[in-house]
UniProtKB/Swiss-Prot annotation:
The keyword Transport does not apply. This is FHIP family protein GF15501. InterPro entries: FHIP, FHIP_C, FHIP_KELAA_motif. The keyword Phosphoprotein applies. Belongs to the FHIP family. Residues 797-856, 907-987 are annotated as: Disordered. Residues 808-824, 942-973 have a biased composition (Low complexity). Pfam families: DUF5917, KELAA, RAI16-like. Keywords: Phosphoprotein. It comes from Drosophila ananassae (Fruit fly). Residues 825-843, 907-933 have a biased composition (Polar residues). The modification Phosphoserine is found at residue 803.
Length: 1041
């Protein structure tokens, strides 16, 4: 080895250390003599070739000798490739020596083919020889890129060794080398698609030649066409660890190749078993998931990325699900459609359906709450993880399918669980619905809400013309602010000298008190970037504007606009014509002859008289609209489903027809221009004598029922509940606004309206928590505790391990069970007994990285401070105290509302956003004030933890937290305890001290619970007021465009 100069002796190893060759340092070109390197390479091959020729059945020493010489040859090739910096392919011209003489010798002497032929006769030593061959191919492919694949002396033995590997079971080290080589080949083919035929068609030709020559057995696939690289990768698709990841990456490259080469797509779809293998494997991995998730906190409501990493079975399942999602994104349309069909028929319906419904021989399990919680948590995780619209459509179809489960829809079963008496099941269900609403899917919104609201029967006839008006939104903002409990108004008045101005004027300089308390940095919107955004109406306005804009952007893709517009339905033309004749006859008899023509003052009086008729009679048939009975618009049909009619087209044709006739839509007629109304027709499409109320659907009934028990719910349930209702208010749909944001519209439903419930809540809090010194003290403590909790949640999201929260984590875990059980005796102590903060680092696998937005935007900073993760805090639980009741007069009113939906129990949850879009899902990490939401989608997004101001549920704790397991308070839903809660939100021991302060505060536990409700209700009303104001801005903008 004289060709190696001083300092390069470490470049060659002994035969006993061949496995470490690749790790030895290779010096620069000046450290070796290329000629000596070439001579040594030829010498080693001559010695190896002598052993190959003279060994009949090779002995152990023979194989060891060949492997040793091959090891030296690999090292010399590596030195040469580093010397050249690139591979110079063999040239046919004799002008000058080749740049890589060792490689030239390897190809010209057909060494690789001779080596393969000998390896087939090595018997039990075949794997050792194959391993060295794979190392050699891996080295050459990685350094030569695509150039060597064009040469038959290299390609032919490579195809032979790959063909002989089909259907074989290899040891782990050999499998690893094989997958690495296949991965490298896929990368090369992706960059050089023109070489694809070498492995797609030529591979089969080579195999047939081998079969004819008898050199290798025929492939076990039995197909007439074979993409050998893809076939070898299929068995490793569900493997764990790095081997499985590399195999799936290579398979995805093959799927992407199918977009560029239709023959590959046809082969994968028709001749390979990848689609059924993926689906059956996904179902098998789902069956291995824990049937009952370990819960260690009272506020747990969804699976987080940390939970995924700490549950091995869940990690494998999410890997497989993410791979399916990626295949649908990049594969050929034929493969995509086949995989979606297999997913629906082979996994979603037969596996997820029974798991969610929890059925056994057609009967529901009676006591399987834990299994239902787990199944719904898995479904929520799936919906937040997938982003491909085609796959999301399959899951939406699954929720709405009424044929696969004996006429029972999955969506209806989920709605029923909102009424479950189990608190954990309610929160998990609401977390799932928050995810579903975050998809902004038209079909889901239609089934949950819009199909019950489109007829407009929930609004009295005399109020229906107000639905699309804009002015009342501003008065609605004032209405929400007036609903604040009296004790909160008094507390706000007392704190005015120390508080930030509600409406700062541009150019105002914050006072020293403001700067000291909150911070002196203000942005363009007047929102400070200091410590807390509590009670800052500008922050709510900013958040509402951003959320409404995002929701509006996603809803632009809907097929229909869903603005209320009562037109006759299909097939009712003759009935309506007869009704119109009756109306004209009625007015001709009592109002004079001739058509109903009004102008100036007469028109205004007549219009008012029609309104008074509707208000006094109560009949919903007296609906009026300015339309020409002879216009083509009267024959337009109103679709109650998205598939029947495109409302946007109808609306445009209607508007054009009205404009041509000089008439205006009712929602464009203000008080000042009623004299422009020239013709009014009554709509008798409904029964003239229809009476009673209508249903808003089971979903809203369940939500309203839970809202009626606001003062008896736990703090976490109320936080999630307000978040879900807030999400509904973000939708730019006047029909939904008529229920939530329009205080001037009367609702005639079978349950109390939203605004009636808010009034009752205000009355109840005012009656049970009067404005006294003790009440103000409790309010101040509750408010301070929630703000303190907000700070801790912000620190947790920042992952600051040096924060007090991280230090308190260790202290909280050190608490003995007796101490934690003692804390559970109080509803407030239950909050402090939950799992403390865990500042966990980012895991290797994060199923939410898609929606993780690392930008430090102003909106992110604002919303992060308003994050409402469901951490137990110094605040108190809102669980009702036994024996507490409202005052006598108020209790009768309250009993009326609670009795109407006494069985409705629900809870709200935060979710993050992937959009149907998701869908999005979306998108970035979704955080909001006083509400929870999904991103998106965002959304596999590592920051998918859902946050909301003043409380909510964080997603940072693992499913196997070491914290002591706690149980739901027996007062939450009248239950004797409940299943253990799985902590999704961190809490520090700071809350323990706050709890002690609250516990020592004068007043009963009921009054302390009401104080928390009052603080939360006050902040939520501000948020609703901000949403109402911003919705008016959006509607005005729409009309001006």
């Amino acid at each position: 080895m004289s060709w190696l100069r001083q300092g390069s002796s470490g470049g060659v190893a002994s035969a006993g250390h061949s496995g470490n060759i690749r790790q030895r340092p290779i010096d620069a070109a000046t450290d070796c003599d290329p000629r000596a390197c070439y001579d040594s390479f030829c010498k080693h091959w001559q010695q190896a070739h002598e052993i190959i020729q003279h060994s009949a059945p090779p002995s152990h020493d023979d194989v060891l000798g060949v492997v040793s010489h091959l090891d030296y040859m690999v090292t010399l090739l590596l030195v040469e490739l580093h010397h050249c910096n690139k591979v110079a392919l063999p040239t046919t011209e004799a002008s000058g020596p080749p740049a890589a003489p060792c490689l030239e010798y390897l190809l010209s002497e057909n060494l690789l083919d001779k080596l393969y032929e000998w390896s087939c006769a090595t018997g039990r030593y075949a794997n050792a020889v194959r391993l060295e061959q794979l190392k050699l191919y891996e080295l050459l492919v990685s350094h030569s890129r695509h150039q060597l694949l064009c040469h038959e002396p290299f390609l032919r033995p490579l195809l032979k060794i790959l063909a002989s590997s089909q259907g074989e079971i290899f040891p782990p080290d050999l499998e690893k080398r094989l997958v690495i080589l296949l991965n490298q080949l896929c990368v090369v083919l992706m960059q050089n698609v023109h070489l694809l035929d070498l492995f797609f068609f030529s591979a089969q030709t080579q195999v047939q030649e081998q079969i004819q020559n008898g050199s290798v057995p025929p492939p076990k696939s039995g197909t007439t066409t074979n993409f050998i690289i893809f076939s070898l990768l299929i068995p490793y698709v569900h493997r764990e660890g790095s081997l499985g990841h590399q195999a799936r990456d290579a398979l995805l490259l093959c799927m992407a190749l199918s977009q560029k080469n239709s023959n590959i797509g046809t082969y994968i779809a028709q001749y390979s078993s990848i689609c059924p293998l993926l689906v059956t494997g996904l179902g098998g991995l789902y069956s291995r998931l824990p049937n009952s998730i370990e819960i260690s906190a009272i506020d747990w409501h969804r699976i987080t990325p940390d939970d995924v990493t700490e549950i091995p079975e869940l990690t494998l399942f999410m890997n497989a699900l993410e791979f399916c999602n990626a295949v649908v994104q990049v594969a050929h349309e034929m493969i995509k459609q086949q995989l979606l069909d297999f997913m629906y028929q082979g996994f979603i319906v037969p596996v997820l359906g029974p798991a969610i419904l929890q059925t056994l021989k057609g009967k529901h399990f009676q006591t399987n709450i834990d299994s239902q919680i787990s199944a719904m948590s898995y479904l929520d995780l799936i919906l937040r993880s997938i982003t491909e619209p085609g796959l999301l459509r399959a899951f939406v179809r699954f929720l709405l399918d009424n044929e696969k489960f004996d006429g029972e829809r999955i969506l209806d079963a989920l709605v029923e669980r909102l009424n479950s008496p189990d608190a954990n099941l309610c929160m998990v269900t609401l977390a799932l619905f928050d995810t579903l609403l975050g998809l902004h899917c038209e079909d889901l919104m239609l089934e949950l809400l819009l199909k019950f609201m489109l007829p407009g029967k929930h609004v009295p006839l005399s109020h229906r013309h107000k639905i699309n008006k804009i002015d009342p939104y501003l008065s609605s903002s004032e209405f929400f602010l007036e609903l604040s409990p009296d004790v909160m108004k008094r507390a706000r008045d007392l704190a005015k000298p120390k508080a930030i101005q509600e409406h700062p004027v541009v150019g105002d300089i914050p006072s020293p008190v403001m700067s000291k308390t909150i911070g002196a940095n203000w942005n363009y919107y007047g929102v400070h970037t200091g410590d807390s955004l509590y009670a800052n109406i500008q922050a709510y306005l900013f958040e509402a504007h951003w959320r409404i804009a995002q929701c509006q952007k996603d809803c632009l893709k809907w097929a229909n606009s869903y603005r209320y517009q009562k037109w006759p339905r299909h097939g009712q033309g003759r009935v309506q014509a007869h009704a119109l004749d009756l109306a004209r006859q009625f007015f001709s008899e009592y109002g004079g002859s001739g058509p109903v023509v009004a102008s100036g003052e007469t028109g205004e009086k007549q219009l008012d008289s029609l309104q008074s008729i509707g208000e006094s009679s109560g009949y919903e048939s007296f609906k009026w609209r300015p339309a020409d009975e002879e216009s083509e618009a009267t024959e337009t049909t109103l679709a109650t489903t998205a598939s029947e009619v495109e409302l946007e087209h109808n609306s445009s044709s209607i508007s054009s027809g009205l404009a041509a006739s000089g008439r205006r839509e009712p929602w464009r007629i203000s008080h000042n221009n009623r004299n422009e109304l020239v013709l009014t027709d009554l709509d008798f499409s409904e029964d003239l004598f229809a009476q009673g109320t209508v249903s808003l659907g089971p979903f809203l009934n369940a939500i309203w029922g839970k809202l009626q028990t606001f003062t008896s719910n736990s703090l976490y349930v109320n936080l999630h509940l307000t978040g879900l209702i807030t999400r509904l208010a973000w939708y730019p749909l006047p029909l939904i606004h008529s229920l939530l944001l329009r205080s001037d519209i009367v609702i005639t439903s079978d349950t109390p309206s939203f605004h009636q419930v808010l009034r009752i809540l205000k009355q109840q809090i005012d009656a049970e928590l009067p404005v006294t010194e003790d009440s103000l003290e409790i309010i101040d403590v509750a408010r301070s505790s929630l703000i303190d909790r907000e700070f801790r949640l912000v620190n947790t999201r920042k992952g600051n391990e040096g924060s007090p929260s991280h230090h308190n984590l260790q202290q909280q875990q050190a608490l003995n069970p007796a101490q934690q059980q003692g804390q559970q005796r109080s509803a407030y102590a239950t909050l402090s007994a939950a799992t403390p903060v865990q500042a966990t680092p980012t895991s290797a696998y994060d199923p939410f990285r898609r929606s993780d937005n690392k930008r430090r935007s102003i909106s992110k900073s604002i919303t992060s401070m308003f994050s409402r993760k469901s951490a137990p805090t110094a605040a108190a639980s809102a669980a009702p105290a036994n024996g507490s009741s409202a005052s006598s007069g108020l209790s009768q009113i309250y009993a009326f509302f609670t009795g109407a939906a006494s069985t409705l129990v629900g809870s709200n949850s935060s979710s993050e956003s992937r959009g149907f879009a998701p869908g999005q899902q979306s998108a970035g990490t979704c955080e909001t004030s006083l509400s929870t939401q999904p991103p998106r989608p965002t959304t596999i997004a590592s920051g998918s933890s859902s946050n909301s101001s003043m409380g909510g549920s964080s997603q940072t704790l693992s499913a196997h937290s070491n914290a002591t397991t706690t149980h739901s308070s027996s007062t939450l839903h009248g239950l004797d305890g409940g299943p253990p809660s799985f902590s999704s939100e961190p809490v520090s021991l700071d809350s323990v001290a706050s709890m002690g302060i609250i516990a020592s505060t004068s007043g009963t536990e009921r009054s302390r619970d009401l104080a928390l409700c009052a603080v939360l209700l006050d902040e939520w009303l501000k948020e609703l007021a901000a949403i109402a104001q911003e919705q008016s801005v959006v509607l005005v903008t729409e009309q001006t465009l």
